[in-house]
Amino acid sequence: MHTINSPDVPSAHAIREQLRAGSEIHVRGHVTHKHHKDFSVELLSGPHIVLHVNFRFEHDHIVAMNTCTNGAWGAEIRHHNPLKHHDHFNLSIHVHEGYYHISVNGEHLADFPHRFPVESVQAIGLKGAAHIDEISFSGFEFGVDWNSQHDFGHAGYNSYGTETYVAPVFQETHSYNAYF
């Protein structure tokens, strides 16, 4: 298992090995309502959002799930948001063949179909109105040092989750271009 303790929000963190069926990601924290009215956990691949899980609190009290490729959003899938202001949560993303099984505090929230290959995921992004205590990863081989530098094949996710963020673009020869 690999754990990231007290990551900043917003931030993006490398997932050093490819996702596969059996991989699990757990994000533990609590809801805050500072200047944001929602928070998101995203699985990222270069300029693409492979999985967007957005907890909304202001107008629609929902969890919206989606994907985004080259700035174009797919069809949004909505579910009831089980969280309220200051609630503690454990968001679990379990990778299965063909879908992500997503639960909150041990309760099934949704199954979201893979719209892009899970092998394309490079990072997890956190942004919005949440304090995150830890992110934990299990079900990987852990054959590399997850704390070392990572070559994304692009400039990385600098300033992810801020107004100045510009999504990175894969280098022309990078193998991940084949996924999109």
From Swiss-Prot:
Keyword Ion transport found: no
PROSITE patterns referenced in this protein's UniProt entry, alphabetically: GALECTIN
Database matches in CDD domains: GLECT (cd00070)
GO biological process: defense response to Gram-positive bacterium; endoplasmic reticulum unfolded protein response; IRE1-mediated unfolded protein response; response to toxic substance
Domain of life: Eukaryota
Key word Nucleotide-binding present: no
Domain Galectin span(s) in chain numbering: 11-138
Keywords: Lectin
Signal peptide stretch: none
One GO cellular component term noted in the UniProt record for this chain: cytoplasmic vesicle
Single GO MF descriptor: galactoside binding
InterPro entries: ConA-like_dom_sf, Galectin-like, Galectin_CRD
The protein's name in its UniProt record: Probable galaptin lec-8
Gene field: lec-8
